[in-house]
């Protein structure tokens, strides 16, 4: 069989000088393909397949139930993915904590990145050593439900069902919820399970009461810390006493030995001072520390003893009440110093530090000397004590130019067979507007005590007043006697304002009303 090729007629060559033909109208030439070439390509393809089959034999895979679509289980994969995600979240949270710690540093104001955490507090069980049960408080029955907030437009609803922000029920529930903002110590009651509604009037009254109670508690707390109480001292006073012991002036403070309306007295053992040799003053072996109370409860009604005293009159109006108490301690120091120079038995002043006065201790081995009210004396000792008291009153009036103003059996001690005078912080000079009245009151207290004690020689208050002051006031009854005393005080006060004299000795040589001496 002859192989016959199939071919298309070829066009002849075109003349160069002939007219040009359009390329779109020119048919494409068909490439002829012989039968021999086709047979050779199929043979080559078969040979290639045989070689591939020989080189790569076919692997037969047996069919099993594990590849069926009905039994596919991916729960373990989901759990692994969740565990991996949780680990990634914890690493992210740890990185946030490091960044937060680095960002805050040692600053007192810190910024928290807790809102950017990925792990929930309930799931983050490894973040704390102690296992704490986390409880979602969103549905806590013990937490009152928050009122529905009012939108910006100011009302809710439409038509007849409009509810404004001024609605009585809405305002009542809001006021009930606002009670949680009161101070922790303010009792607001338990309203669980009750739909409480407080009116604006009641809520405003409660709010004002809560604020006033908070301010009052703060004042009481401050007053307790900054004021002395009975048998106790405030921190500032305690610090002053500690400095006295630390400096070596006092060896030790044993405890409280007496309490009064204005002061508390402590016992202490004396030490030594660095400038003790220079001053020539030795600290007693036993000392009494008189701490004036800073509560101001008793001093408010006792300012008349100091504001009219010319020694402190100019300073009294310029001081606040707390500094006035320090002036009381200073006044007692000056009075004791004046009495000590006159030889009157009284405590010796060692040191004055603000409102703390250190004096010599009248007693022995931490046992204070008894008061005349407490001691039991025989008739001879009581008589001796009376004449000693009379002499001390005359000596205090004439030599010290002072009136005790609170002399009684409670402010006189019996020690070593002598009468000792104490508590002279309120003592004034006779030129005081009420000095003679204070002297008459002292005479009454002394006369009544010794008359009750069995001293028949004791003078009455009018006779004792004339004996001490040297004035010859003759009056049959107490009312007339007091009237003459007030008249004398008025004359003396007018004389002081007219002449400007500050001397305190009365002229007693003539019978005229007492005036101030020129010297």
Swiss-Prot record:
Its cofactor is Mg(2+). ATP binds at residues 257-265, 290. Residues 124-134 have a biased composition (Acidic residues). Residues 251-519 form the Protein kinase domain. It comes from the Eukaryota. GO terms for biological process: cellular response to dsDNA; cellular response to dsRNA; cellular response to virus; defense response to virus; innate immune response; maturation of SSU-rRNA; negative regulation of canonical NF-kappaB signal transduction; negative regulation of MDA-5 signaling pathway. It is found in: Cytoplasm. It catalyses: L-seryl-[protein] + ATP = O-phospho-L-seryl-[protein] + ADP + H(+); L-threonyl-[protein] + ATP = O-phospho-L-threonyl-[protein] + ADP + H(+). Pfam families: RIO1 (PF01163). Residues 122-159 are annotated as: Disordered. InterPro entries: Kinase-like_dom_sf, RIO-type_Ser/Thr_kinase, RIO_dom, RIO_kinase, RIO_kinase_CS, Ser/Thr_kinase_Rio3. CDD domains: RIO3_euk. GO terms for molecular function: ATP binding; caspase binding; metal ion binding; protein serine kinase activity; protein serine/threonine kinase activity. The modification Phosphoserine is found at residues 8, 112, 125, 127-128, 512. Keywords: Antiviral defense, ATP-binding, Cytoplasm, Immunity, Innate immunity, Kinase, Magnesium, Metal-binding, Nucleotide-binding, Phosphoprotein, Ribosome biogenesis, Serine/threonine-protein kinase, Transferase. The active site is at residue 406. Involved in regulation of type I interferon (IFN)-dependent immune response which plays a critical role in the innate immune response against DNA and RNA viruses. May act as an adapter protein essential for the recruitment of TBK1 to IRF3. Phosphorylates IFIH1 on 'Ser-828' interfering with IFIH1 filament assembly on long dsRNA and resulting in attenuated IFIH1-signaling. Can inhibit CASP10 isoform 7-mediated activation of the NF-kappaB signaling pathway. May play a role in the biogenesis of the 40S ribosomal subunit. Involved in the processing of 21S pre-rRNA to the mature 18S rRNA. Belongs to the protein kinase superfamily. RIO-type Ser/Thr kinase family. Interacts with CASP10. Interacts with IRF3; RIOK3 probably mediates the interaction of TBK1 with IRF3. Associated with 40S pre-ribosomal particles. This is Serine/threonine-protein kinase RIO3. It comes from Mus musculus (Mouse).
């Amino acid at each position: 069989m002859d192989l016959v090729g199939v071919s298309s007629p070829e066009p002849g060559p075109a003349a160069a000088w002939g007219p040009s033909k359009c390329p779109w109208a020119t048919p494409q030439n068909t490439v002829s393909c012989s039968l021999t070439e086709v047979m050779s390509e199929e043979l080559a393809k078969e040979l290639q397949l045989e070689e591939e089959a020989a080189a790569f034999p076919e692997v037969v895979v047996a069919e099993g139930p594990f590849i069926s679509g009905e039994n596919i289980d991916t729960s373990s994969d989901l759990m692994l993915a969740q565990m991996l995600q949780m680990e990634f979240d914890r690493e992210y949270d740890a990185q946030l904590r490091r960044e937060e710690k680095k960002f805050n540093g040692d600053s007192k104001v810190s910024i928290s990145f807790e809102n950017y955490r990925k792990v929930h507090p309930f799931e983050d069980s490894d973040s704390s050593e102690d296992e704490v049960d986390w409880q979602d408080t969103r549905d806590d029955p013990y937490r009152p439900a928050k009122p529905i907030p009012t939108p910006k437009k100011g009302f809710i609803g439409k038509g007849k069902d409009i509810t404004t922000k001024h609605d009585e029920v809405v305002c009542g529930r809001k006021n009930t919820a606002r009670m949680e903002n009161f101070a922790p110590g303010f009792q607001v009651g338990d309203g669980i399970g009750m739909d409480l509604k407080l009116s604006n009037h009641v809520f405003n009254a409660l709010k004002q009461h809560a604020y006033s109670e908070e301010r009052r508690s703060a004042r009481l707390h401050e007053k307790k810390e900054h004021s002395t109480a009975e048998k106790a001292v405030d921190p500032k006073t305690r610090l002053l006493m500690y400095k006295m012991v630390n400096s070596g002036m006092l060896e030790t403070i044993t405890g409280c030995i007496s309490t009064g309306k204005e002061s508390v007295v402590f016992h202490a053992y004396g030490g030594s001072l660095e400038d003790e040799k220079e001053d020539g003053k030795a600290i007693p072996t036993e000392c009494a520390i008189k701490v004036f109370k800073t509560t101001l409860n008793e001093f408010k009604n006792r300012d008349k003893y100091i504001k009219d005293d010319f020694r402190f009159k100019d300073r009294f109006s310029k001081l606040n009440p707390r500094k006035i108490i320090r002036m009381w301690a200073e006044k007692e120091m000056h009075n004791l110093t004046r009495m000590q120079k006159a030889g009157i038995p009284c405590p010796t002043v060692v040191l004055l530090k603000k409102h703390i006065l250190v004096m010599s201790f009248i007693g022995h081995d931490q046992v204070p000397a008894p008061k005349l009210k407490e001691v039991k004396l025989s008739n001879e000792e009581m008589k001796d004590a009376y004449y000693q008291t009379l002499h001390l009153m005359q000596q205090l009036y004439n030599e010290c130019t002072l009136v005790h103003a609170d002399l009684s059996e409670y402010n006189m001690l019996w020690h070593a067979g002598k009468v000792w005078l104490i508590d002279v912080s309120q003592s004034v000079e006779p030129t005081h507007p009420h000095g003679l009245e204070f002297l008459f009151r002292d005479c009454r207290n002394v006369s009544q005590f010794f008359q009750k004690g069995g001293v028949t020689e004791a003078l009455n208050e009018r006779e004792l007043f004339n004996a001490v002051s040297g004035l010859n006031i003759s009056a049959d009854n107490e009312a007339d006697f007091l009237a003459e005393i007030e008249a004398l005080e008025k004359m003396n006060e007018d004389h002081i304002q007219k002449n400007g004299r500050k001397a305190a000795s009365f002229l007693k040589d003539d019978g005229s009303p007492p005036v101030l001496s020129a010297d």
